[in-house]
Design a protein with these regions (language model features):
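Glycine-rich, mobile lid/loop segments that gate access to catalytic sites or pores
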Residues: 132-227, 231, 243-250
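Terminal-appendage/accessory-domain detector
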Residues: 1-118, 217-227, 234-504
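Short amphipathic alpha-helical face segments that pack within enzyme cores
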Residues: 122-130, 172, 176-180, 291-298, ...
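Hydrophobic alpha-helical hairpins/lids featuring a short glycine-rich hinge
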Residues: 100-156
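Residue-level signal for well-ordered alpha-helical scaffold segments within enzymatic catalytic domains
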Residues: 127-130, 231, 256
Length: 504
């Protein structure tokens, strides 16, 4: 129930008709009604719970608090809610999406998907939820929008690599978010087609945001795209047009940013009206760190029980796939990944740091594991700087050549060499929380993650209220959808009132 289309660059005098363009095919698929099955219904609810958990856990971190203070400058009666703030406070949906997206992304703690282009498809949820609230949509409408967005992002992620051209993975979020909004609102294909052209045109960004000293922009990178997607849909609904063909044009995305004018991509899209189950091929995180590091943390937990004295470690070699080596490993050539003074955003993308701390502590915490004193321990720094990653052909093969997204080997083999020359060797293919892992996440694990992360931030009453709403997602009316962003305790929440620090 899927069809593959070849996407290539055409000269100006031989452009394909609109109906043959990838953006149109995405728009046409997105706007065709489809049946929602129970598994997808449940998983969308799980990801709403997951997003809310990690967002509340990050609620007072500076990038999140500042994004919230920007949203506070844009109130709107009948608008959308902001995570943490009381439900009777509403804001323009694009600004609510901005604030909520930043909160969801900040801790690098929500869902992921690994393909030729990795990504975090849970980033689609905040803008779609914000528009659903402002436009009075139901829980079923919301599920349709979110399931569609996941479908589009995964189709693109499996066909088009952005990272090899140093383009950030949020580039695939622009069409997926826009398609999801079109499905949510029941729009005509031409509106979504025009909006995809707009959103993609302004949302392709370089991967410098994930290189060297990683800045607080990482939290708002998807928020920016979500805001652009909402604005693109609004503009297209008013009859405006956008750059096209955005993929196939000789000055378009493929010709100028990706494989060039001779490129040909094969993109497989779910057929119109077919079930949209791509969300079931994605997975969340048990640990607050880049997804490439999830199995590495779990492997460190396992190996530490066989190490009597960490001070006797001479070296640690992590053999893994290219993505891990270049994005989180020593193959990035970023000295900041070995620097205890580096930003938190940098350290959660340092395989060397997270393996060292996990090996020492046997636990991982979204705050304590990155604490300033924790990262500056002399013994930690000494161990950390003994660790290197290596791109390994076998791990590349197990990742690149496996067609089933869930069966791709994402982990590593670790060799610990001791001062006496002896070695400890072990490997792990996927994280424990992965669908094929030792303890795959189900509804109970999502709920437990939520309860653990919001303890001391949301009241017991609010925790119960939110979980009841989220687990009943498919039956919610438009009023119930307004309750899908949890509220923080007023005594806990910072930046809860509009201020004059910026322009707004």
């Amino acid at each position: 129930m899927a069809s593959t289309t070849e996407v290539r660059v055409y000269p100006p005098d031989a452009l394909p008709p609109k109906e043959a363009q990838l953006a149109w095919k995405i728009a046409e698929m997105a706007t065709t009604p489809f049946a929602i099955d129970a598994e997808v219904d449940d998983m969308v609810a799980n990801r709403i719970i997951d997003n809310a958990a990690v967002a509340l856990a990050a609620i007072n971190r500076a990038p999140v608090a500042n994004a919230r203070s920007q949203a506070l400058a844009h109130p709107r009666a009948g608008g959308a809610t902001v995570i943490g703030l009381p439900g009777d406070q509403m804001f323009e949906c694009e600004w609510a999406a901005w604030a909520n997206s930043a909160a969801v992304r900040e801790l690098d703690f929500h869902d992921s998907f690994m393909a030729v282009e990795p990504g975090h498809p849970g980033d689609n949820i905040p803008p779609i939820l914000a528009v659903a609230q402002q436009c009075g949509r139901t829980g079923r409408d919301l599920i349709r929008g979110i399931a569609t967005a996941y479908e589009v992002q995964l189709s693109l992620a499996q066909a088009m690599a952005l990272n090899t051209h140093r383009i950030d993975h949020v580039g695939h979020l622009a069409p997926s978010m826009t398609a999801g909004l079109g499905a949510l609102l029941g729009l005509a294909p031409d509106i979504v087609y025009q909006a995809i052209g707009h959103a993609l045109h302004v949302s392709t960004a370089t991967r410098q945001c994930r290189k060297g000293t990683i800045s607080s922009w990482k939290a708002v990178a998807p928020a920016h795209v979500g805001k652009c997607a909402i604005e693109a849909i609004d503009r297209a609904m008013r009859g405006e047009t956008s750059p096209s063909p955005i993929y196939e044009g000789d000055y378009g995305v493929i010709a100028t940013l990706l494989d060039g004018p001779e490129a040909c991509y094969r993109v497989t899209l779910t057929d119109r009206g077919a079930p949209r189950r791509a969300i079931l091929d994605t997975y969340t995180k048990e640990h607050s760190a880049g997804y490439h590091g999830q199995p590495i943390i779990d492997l460190a937990f396992k190996m530490r029980t066989r190490v009597d004295d960490l001070s006797k470690i001479e070296s640690v070699d992590i053999f893994t796939k290219r993505f891990t080596h270049e994005v989180m490993g020593s193959g990035s050539n970023d000295p900041q990944k070995y620097d205890p003074d580096a930003s938190r955003e940098t350290l959660d993308h340092s395989a060397m740091y997270i393996f060292a701390v996990a090996l020492e502590d046997g636990a991982w915490h979204h705050e304590l594991s990155y604490d300033w004193d924790r990262r500056h321990r002399p013994e930690t720094v000494a161990l950390w700087r003994k660790i290197k990653t290596h791109e390994d052909p076998e791990w590349n093969r197990r990742y690149d050549d496996e067609p089933d997204p869930l069966k791709k080997a994402q982990g590593a083999r670790v060799e610990i060499t001791f001062a006496d020359g002896s070695k400890l060797v072990d490997e792990q293919a996927v994280a424990n929380s992965h669908p094929l892992g030792a303890v795959p996440f189900g509804r109970a694990e999502y709920v437990e993650k939520f309860r653990a992360l919001v303890s001391g931030i949301a009241s017991d009453f609010e925790t119960a209220r939110f979980l009841e709403a989220a687990t009943g997602l498919g039956s919610l009316d438009s009023g119930g959808v307004m309750g899908l962003n949890p509220v923080a305790d007023a005594l806990v929440l910072e930046r809860a009132a509009r201020d004059q620090r910026g322009i707004f």
